[in-house]
């Protein structure tokens, strides 16, 4: 089995590839090769039971993905994107990478022909939904994004559905919750503070909170995000039907509930490292995001996430900090 990971140098891509290296198989099929594409070289896991190839390329340019698709990978995991804040700040770059990149990928698959029909897992986002919201967004809620990033992902979902309907590939779109707690340094995502206010205090560093304590959002851990990819790659897609884009399960919490969970897990000294510095730009972006979901379809189809924000924090401590933190 040959797996192509687009955006393989990013956090979720790295963790997905590490999971593949650990398991050595996917859905009961042995993995022969993993190709990790990105604009920078992806690092190989410490030990891989398969051939690993890191390819540096730009799928947002015409023909930028053709050579990779010519290899006819069995599974394509499309993670390549720029994040929400950057897509909002740079309109042209956002559409070039988040939309043109997906369109070039889908067309490259279509043009191979000869019965080639890979599984394509496309990572979308809950940013495809826009206000006004219900208290809980049901699976039937319409997509009216209020950011450029959300619009780019919504268009990608439509393309995925149509190319799947036409038989060019077997696509599954997964709308990721905000992935929290993200390891590493802060990125340009408008949602980055959700992770920052947990990660930095646990590392003994101060974190900036730019929004109100009452902001509510939908979260899942990096561990769950990898689990979503694994399940989307291996599931029986006949059970999905024609509605190929699914809202992933997660846990809804206010910022205040996040902080209280951190207090329960790590103590008051850690919580005191959070500093409130309001940012109206971030606040405005987040105000247009959904807060809570009733993700019935994905749960019925076997997708799983954490059941509390305390669990999300403990996953981060276990997976990234070796079970310890700075008290």
PLM segments and residue spans:
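N-terminal Rossmann NAD(P)H-binding glycine-rich loop of SDR-like oxidoreductase domains
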Residues: 1-26
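Conserved C-terminal active-site "lid" loop/helix of NAD(P)H-dependent oxidoreductases
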Residues: 43, 222, 279-303
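NAD(P)H-binding glycine-rich loop region in Rossmannoid oxidoreductase-like domains
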Residues: 59-97
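Conserved Rossmann-fold NAD(P)-dependent oxidoreductase catalytic core, especially the SDR/UDP-sugar
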Residues: 103-147
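Active-site Tyr-X1-5-Lys
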Residues: 131, 146-172
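NAD(P)-dependent short-chain dehydrogenase/reductase
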Residues: 161-217, 222-227
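Amphipathic terminal alpha-helices
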Residues: 290-300, 307-327
């Amino acid at each position: 089995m040959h797996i192509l990971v687009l955006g393989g140098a990013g956090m979720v891509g790295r963790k997905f590839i590490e999971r593949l290296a650990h398991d050595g198989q996917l859905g009961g099929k042995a993995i022969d090769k993993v190709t990790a594409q990105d604009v920078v070289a992806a690092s190989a896991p410490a030990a891989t039971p398969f051939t690993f190839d890191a390819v540096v390329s730009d799928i947002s340019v015409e023909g930028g993905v053709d050579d990779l698709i010519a290899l006819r990978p069995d599974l394509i995991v499309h993670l390549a994107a720029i994040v929400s804040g950057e897509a909002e700040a740079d309109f042209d770059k956002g559409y070039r990478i988040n939309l043109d990149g997906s369109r070039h990928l889908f067309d490259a698959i279509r043009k191979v022909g000869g019965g080639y029909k890979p599984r394509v897992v496309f990572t979308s986002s809950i940013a495809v939904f826009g206000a006004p919201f219900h208290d809980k967004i049901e699976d039937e809620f319409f997509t009216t994004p209020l950011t450029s990033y959300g619009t780019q992902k919504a268009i990608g979902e439509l393309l995925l559905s149509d190319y799947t309907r036409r038989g060019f590939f077997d696509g599954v779109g997964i709308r990721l919750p905000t992935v929290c707690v993200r390891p590493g340094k802060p990125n340009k995502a408008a949602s980055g503070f959700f992770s920052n206010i947990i990660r930095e205090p646990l590392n003994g560093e101060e974190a900036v909170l730019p929004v109100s304590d009452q902001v509510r959002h939908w979260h899942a851990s990096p561990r769950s995000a990898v689990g979503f990819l694994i399940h989307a790659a291996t599931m029986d897609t006949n059970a999905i039907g024609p509605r190929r884009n699914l809202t992933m399960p997660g846990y809804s919490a206010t910022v205040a509930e996040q902080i209280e969970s951190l207090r329960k897990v790590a103590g008051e000294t850690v919580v005191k490292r959070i500093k409130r510095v309001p940012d109206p730009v971030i606040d405005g972006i987040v105000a247009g995001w959904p807060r809570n979901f009733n993700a019935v379809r994905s749960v019925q189809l076997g997708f799983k996430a954490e059941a509390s924000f305390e669990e999300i924090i403990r996953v981060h401590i276990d997976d990234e900090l070796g079970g310890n933190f700075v008290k």
